[in-house]
Swiss-Prot record:
Protein name: Glycine--tRNA ligase
Primary role: Catalyzes the attachment of glycine to tRNA(Gly).
Family matches, as Pfam families: HGTP_anticodon, tRNA-synt_2b
GO molecular function: ATP binding; glycine-tRNA ligase activity; protein dimerization activity
Binding of ATP, residues: 196-198, 206-211, 323-324, 440-443
One cellular component term from this protein's GO annotations in UniProt: cytoplasm
Amino acid sequence: MINVNHERTMTVARKRGFLWSSFEIYSGVAGFVDYGPLGATLKNKIMNRWREFYVVREGFYEIESPTIMPEEALKASGHVDHFNDPMTQCKECMDVYRADHIIEDATGRDVEGLENQELTEIISDEGIRCPRCGGHLTHVWSYNLMFQTLIGARGKKTGYLRPETAQGIFIPFKRLLRFFRNRLPFGVVQLGKSYRNEISPRQGVIRLREFTQAEAEIFVDPEHKTHPDFEEVKEDILRLYPAGRQMEESGTVDMTAAEALEAGVISSEVLTYHLCLAKRFLMDIGIPEDALRFRQHLPSEMAHYAIDCWDVEAFTDSYGWIEIIGIADRTDYDLRSHSQHSGEDLRVFIEYDEPRRIRKRAVKPDMGKLGPKFRKDAARIASALSEVDVEEIEKALDEEGRFILEGEFEILPDDVSFEDVEEVVTGRKVYPHVIEPSFGIDRIIYTLLLHSLVDDGERTYFRLPPHVAPVEVTVLPLVNREEMVMTALEIERNLRRSGFIAEFDSSGTIGRRYARADEIGVPFAVTVDHETLEDGTVTLRNRDDCSQVRVKIEELVPTLEKLRG
């Protein structure tokens, strides 16, 4: 069993300036957290490390979009209609709860994905009462998780705080496609705040109303979901918990990436590659391999936009296995939906190696109907119809009795006909499919702190890798003699100017100062002592094993650069 301690971790994190409850002097507000000086530095280092993986190494580009979005954009994405949690309320004390969570707490049953009526019946059949006062609970209803606001002083335009960063990438897709010279595949990332008005956020950093995401949207040809670098990761071991094994309750299975792909456990090569990349990132920042597993979404919990989705989960002692990353194949849902709602063609033209003769289904506008109906717009509408996916038009007419073009013009079954035609084509137009790794930065930081804390009875410290530690080196004069203090201050100044996050500490005994630095995860301590004044060398101490070596002052920077990695 993995040995971690939530209470001890959070005690140290609060005490030493990593994480604090927000608005403490006003009794606090659930679902919000402050990052103290060390926490904010750690967070920025992790986000920058993420950029190294996804922007520098993968060659993706980062954009930044507004955190407030208009209602029509989120209507198109499905969030207005589908971004809901099941809620119930106590009839006596009026406290509200997530219905699936209160059932799971009371019965141990996993009920995620069940319909509201089913949850209501379970609450009734099991006699589940309010945890606070024992009162009866109401029927279960859907509660939309988005924060609503009004845009502009007149208050006539509804907006929402964004529930994810992804939509800010999908909406400017036409400009992004042009930037990438109209070629697939390409990747775009965004890091920033997202917002979800959680019903009852009682799990600290695990369930926040304002949280930080790092998301990549990789646009790929639906017919070619491969990855050029798969060979580099094919032997990586993944601890998988596929949907089938969950339903059989048969536990996880360790497989190489190549084995998982060949067995059809993971749906595509590109998705498998990104599971491996996520694991490599987490291990790089210091989360141990045995604390991680990859759980596939069950059919009942699969997001409305996904055909395959895996959560990277981390073990915790207080919350069990928690999701810290979601990696999904979103198919063409987002681009197709935004195309339909906005009237913009968000397809990509993929050129064939040589022209092909094909038979295809074509739409034939009836100008005798469109002319009187749309007058001056008729010719443009006829042209626009020829650019729309014919299957999309036929499906809408069959299922809904109408097709809405460009979000405005209603096309009825009598307005068009369909025919099979033969033509020579030089390429095909497709909606790209999207592979999305979505990282919950706050949960990752919590997981890292939880699994980094060492409390062996003699010392308590965060064993953070040097490249993510918020303070990289502390400089200590052995005693408070002026010559030692001045030399230590000069070394600290030089380290900062050389790109290190360094601090100077002369308060208390040398043992107490080592302990203080260890506790916050400082990997290296430089001690200025009597020998320093004689021969220009300092003691360089390693946090993890307390080993010490003598280093010349002029060699300190290159030595630390090598150790930091």
